[in-house]
């Protein structure tokens, strides 16, 4: 099979540059395009050079339609508005769309779901192997423990992150809720402040910390009577997300239309 030709959306950002490096060093994939916002000062620059690699000949562009003429997929770690704009073009072109963008709303998710009858989409709040294994563990632990164990999720990221809770924290919250057989939306508690009253049994709490250059720390706490279980993942480099996203793209190339998660990619969906 020929190399998978991938477009990197948000190519000038930190994740975009990590993706360019990951694709360049992985057999079976090539950078076919580098997408940036129309207002970016980086348009026209070489994608390889921006990623700290030798020049690749691929220039940053704001025209996804033109970039996608001969591409097989797009890997998208941008912002919700950009991702939703990319969804229709990716579906129309028949490209695999790997979405790692966080901060998506319910209406954004509905737009993404609307194309999956004809498009192959992999969407996850976190693309790393470790976090997705953690989510599987969280689901199993939540299934095993009753409401006597309170669930709290604590996450910390660098000071430039613009959304909270993180997509990973929400992924872990969904895993905990699934383990308990409930809907996260009905039990999620965020941003406690002031006199909140006693904690209700069954709540799933979130606390978000921001500061420094932290790539991503997540801890799921199961606090019971006189004992506490803590499950933690610490990301030390964005390359774990880049390699996970690339693995998802290569896997999705052989799948039919549908909406998939990293649990599907890693064979964890039945855990």
From Swiss-Prot:
The record places the active site at 157, 161
User: Which Gene Ontology MF annotations are present?
Assistant: 4-hydroxy-tetrahydrodipicolinate reductase; NAD binding; NADP binding; oxidoreductase activity, acting on CH or CH2 groups, NAD or NADP as acceptor
> What cystine linkages occur within this chain?
none
Class of the enzyme per the UniProt entry, highest EC level: oxidoreductase
Annotated residues that bind NAD(+) are located at: 10-15, 36, 100-102, 124-127
Q: Which reaction does it catalyse?
A: (S)-2,3,4,5-tetrahydrodipicolinate + NAD(+) + H2O = (2S,4S)-4-hydroxy-2,3,4,5-tetrahydrodipicolinate + NADH + H(+); (S)-2,3,4,5-tetrahydrodipicolinate + NADP(+) + H2O = (2S,4S)-4-hydroxy-2,3,4,5-tetrahydrodipicolinate + NADPH + H(+)
Q: Does the keyword Amino-acid biosynthesis apply?
A: yes
- Which family, according to UniProt? Belongs to the DapB family.
HAMAP family registered for this protein in UniProt: DapB (MF_00102)
Name-wise, this protein is 4-hydroxy-tetrahydrodipicolinate reductase
Which taxonomic lineage is given here? Bacteria, Pseudomonadati, Pseudomonadota, Alphaproteobacteria, Hyphomicrobiales
């Amino acid at each position: 099979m020929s190399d998978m030709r991938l477009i990197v959306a948000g190519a000038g950002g930190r994740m975009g540059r990590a993706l360019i490096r990951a694709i360049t060093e992985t057999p079976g994939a090539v950078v076919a395009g580098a997408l940036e916002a129309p207002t970016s000062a980086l348009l026209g620059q070489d994608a390889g050079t921006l990623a700290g690699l030798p020049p690749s000949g691929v220039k940053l562009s704001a025209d996804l339609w033109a970039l996608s003429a001969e591409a097989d997929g797009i890997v998208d770690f941008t912002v919700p508005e950009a991702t939703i704009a990319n969804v229709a073009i990716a579906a129309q072109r028949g490209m695999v769309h790997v979405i790692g963008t966080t901060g998506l709303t319910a209406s954004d998710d509905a737009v993404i779901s609307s194309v999956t009858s004809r498009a192959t989409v992999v969407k996850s709040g976190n693309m790393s192997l470790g976090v997705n294994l953690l989510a599987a563990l969280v689901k199993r632990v939540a299934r095993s423990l009753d409401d006597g164990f309170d669930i709290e999720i604590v996450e910390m990221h660098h000071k430039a992150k613009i959304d909270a809770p993180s997509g990973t924290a929400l992924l872990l919250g969904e895993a905990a809720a699934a383990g308990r057989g409930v809907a996260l939306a009905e039990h999620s508690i965020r941003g406690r402040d002031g006199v909140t009253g006693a904690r209700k049994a069954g709540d799933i709490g979130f606390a978000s910390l921001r500061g420094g250059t932290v790539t991503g720390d997540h801890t799921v706490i199961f606090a019971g009577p006189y004992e506490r279980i803590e499950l933690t993942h610490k990301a030390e480099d964005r390359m774990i997300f880049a390699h996970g996203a690339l693995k998802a793209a290569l896997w999705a190339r052989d799948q039919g239309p549908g909406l998939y998660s990293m649990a599907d990619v890693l064979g964890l969906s039945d855990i």
